[in-house]
Amino acid sequence: MNTEKLETLLGFYKQYKALSEYIDKKYKLSLNDLAVLDLTMKHCKDEKVLMQSFLKTAMDELDLSRTKLLVSIRRLIEKERLSKVRSSKDERKIYIYLNNDDISKFNALFEDVEQFLNI
């Protein structure tokens, strides 16, 4: 690997590390949480999605374990960045979705990340 490619790779790492520390300090979130939040925006913005279905999709798309996904989802719900509701017909079924407040917080968070990264 030549020096230029190595420097580019190191630059990516520094940017990744800086972003990780920034969102942890400011929002108490991880990069996994951001990835899950972005995926929920793509799949749960317009309708409530069954948690099991979302987990399968997220495991495939994000290549994260079920445990890590559940931790991120729980954290996002606690931070009121994602909403959930239990089915009235079957208590075992849980749906996740983004309400208008969640979407506003999503947009503000990702605008802040864009400013931090200068993109």
From Swiss-Prot:
This is HTH-type transcriptional regulator SarX. InterPro entries: SarA/Rot_dom (IPR010166), Transc_reg_Sar_Rot_HTH (IPR055166), WH-like_DNA-bd_sf (IPR036388), WH_DNA-bd_sf (IPR036390). Involved in the regulation of virulence genes. Acts as a repressor of the agr locus and consequently targets genes regulated by the agr system such as sspA, hla and hlb. Binds directly to the agr promoter region. Gene3D superfamilies: Winged helix-like DNA-binding domain superfamily/Winged helix DNA-binding domain (1.10.10.10). The gene is sarX. Belongs to the SarA family. Residues 55-78 bind DNA. GO terms for cellular component: cytoplasm. GO terms for biological process: regulation of DNA-templated transcription. The keyword DNA-binding applies. Its main location: cytoplasm. It comes from the Bacteria. It is found in: Cytoplasm. Induction: Transcriptionally activated by MgrA. Expressed maximally during the stationary phase of growth. It comes from Staphylococcus aureus (strain NCTC 8325 / PS 47). Pfam families: Staph_reg_Sar_Rot. NCBIfam families: Staph_reg_Sar. One of its GO terms (molecular function) is DNA binding. Keywords: Cytoplasm, DNA-binding, Repressor, Transcription, Transcription regulation, Virulence.
